Amino acid sequence: MNKKQTIILSIGIPLFLLLGIVGMKFHNEIYAWTLGDVKSLYVQAESLYQQKEYEEARKLYAKLAGIDSASRCQYVLGDMYFQGQGGERDYEKARKLFIQAAEGGNADAQNNLGYIYTMGIGTDTDFHEAKKWLRMAAAQSHPQAMVGLGSLYRNGWGVLKDHKEAFKLYRRAAAHGNTDAMNNLGYMHTFGYGTYTSIRDALYYIQKSAVLNNPVALYNMATFHIEGHGFPKNMEKGAEYLKAAAQLGLPAAQFNLGRMYQLGKGVEQNDQEAERLFRQASAQGHQLATDFLMKMEAKDSTSVNDSIFEMKMIVR
């Protein structure tokens, strides 16, 4: 290659890249211009979303999501596809929109991708991909991403199991007011994972989370009262916490409260209430609730004398 060709190449490649960037920016501005007053459109979309007018909000977000820099709109539209708000649920479209938003730096989208890849929702489980996105969101101080990343370390998913690192991440998230993190700190103190064992400290964190209406923490408070950890055994108090968690839609709480109504423990015996709670839990995929519901429908009396509970602590 002669000197002239070298000079042309050295100028041409950066110039080509610059033209590409300018071209993309120009295309983005042209698209935004065709939408009219973008700010007004965004305010309208947000307002419709807050009013739960999901179908109309979804249409506006779909227009706005076409702007490359509109990561917030891409995230919200993705979440609407994920939740099935304003139309059909579509996990694949949700994931693609989350990727767009996450690449634009949206921490909520990065966190959601971490969750999707951890749980394998609409795609294969991929802990390494989950770790990548959760780390990016956690670096932006996203509390729920810290919880998700902590859970990868707690379980050894895609990383070496490290309870101390998990505890550190939960503590950081709890400092931001995250109630899942508070509950998880209580769980770690209960069993001495990554920290010292202390029922007193466990109760401190779980109660703090329960006061803020975290359903898992409310459920865990029920386990302490029913099993007699940190308190004298008290089925009535346990039932109160289970009622609160069940009302917030936690399947494990619905099932165990149903068993209490079926057996008349901590509450007045009531088969109709037991059946109602079993149906709620079963609809969310709780297998034991489904089994007991089938026994009730078959009028199988053996289930009434069966003392099965599922009072195990839950962590997120």
Task: Cite the ranges covered by each PLM segment.
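Positively charged n-region of N-terminal signal peptides that target proteins for export
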Residues: M1-Q5
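Hydrophobic membrane-insertion alpha-helices, especially the h-region
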Residues: S10-V22
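N-terminal leader/linker segments that initiate helical-solenoid repeat arrays
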Residues: V22-L60, R72, V76, F309, ...
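Short helix-capping/linker turns of helical repeat alpha-solenoids
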Residues: G36, L48, I67-A70, Q83-Q85, ...
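Hydrophobic face of amphipathic alpha-helices that form TPR/SEL1-like repeat modules
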Residues: L41-L48, Q74-Q83, G87, L97, ...
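Structural signature of tandem alpha-helical TPR/SEL1-like repeats
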Residues: K52-K59, E88-Q100, D124-M136, L160-R172, ...
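Terminal, low-structured helical/coil segments at or just beyond the last alpha-helical repeat
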Residues: E268, R279-R316
